[in-house]
């Protein structure tokens, strides 16, 4: 039985965070086309709502004809004490209209305690609520 390996590329988001790296919208669209030409399955375009360039990218990439790649939007769980349906960043993920959405949730106790300032159970509830509100 043959298994297919699918490639999920994060160059446009994670790669853009490198020191001295500042991809323009045109750069991101050119890289998208090149990754698609190479047969990459998923291209993570950025974090809609985190900056104007990523919002522009998700609008502009809709006009790019891709052969195989599916565009993914990246984001996090909603903020504590905010209904997921009312969370700005989750709303921007939905509005981006990407083929795929990649949502991360904090897993390390230190991050849950110090960054989110919620209990572990509350954090798990926040992660579960995303599916109920937006999937």
Regions found by a protein language model. Give the residues of each.
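Short, well-ordered coil/turn segments that N-cap beta-strands
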Residues: 2-5, 39-41, 66-71, 97-99
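Active-site mouth loops of central-metabolism enzymes
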Residues: 8-27, 73-84, 112-124
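Conserved small/polar residues in nucleotide/adenosyl-binding loops
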Residues: 133-135
């Amino acid at each position: 039985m043959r298994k297919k390996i699918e490639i999920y590329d994060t160059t446009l988001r994670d790669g853009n965070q490198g020191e001295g790296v500042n991809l323009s919208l045109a750069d991101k669209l050119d890289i998208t086309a090149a990754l698609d030409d190479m047969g990459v399955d998923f291209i993570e375009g950025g974090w809609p709502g985190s900056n104007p360039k990523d919002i522009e990218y998700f609008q502009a990439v809709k006009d790019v004809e891709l052969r195989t790649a599916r565009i993914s939007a990246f984001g996090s769980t909603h903020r504590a004490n905010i209904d997921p349906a009312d969370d700005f960043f989750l709303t921007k993920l939905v509005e981006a209209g990407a083929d795929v959405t990649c949502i991360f949730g904090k897993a390390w106790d230190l991050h849950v305690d110090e960054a989110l300032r919620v209990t572990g159970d509350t954090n798990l509830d926040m992660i579960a609520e995303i599916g109920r509100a937006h999937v």
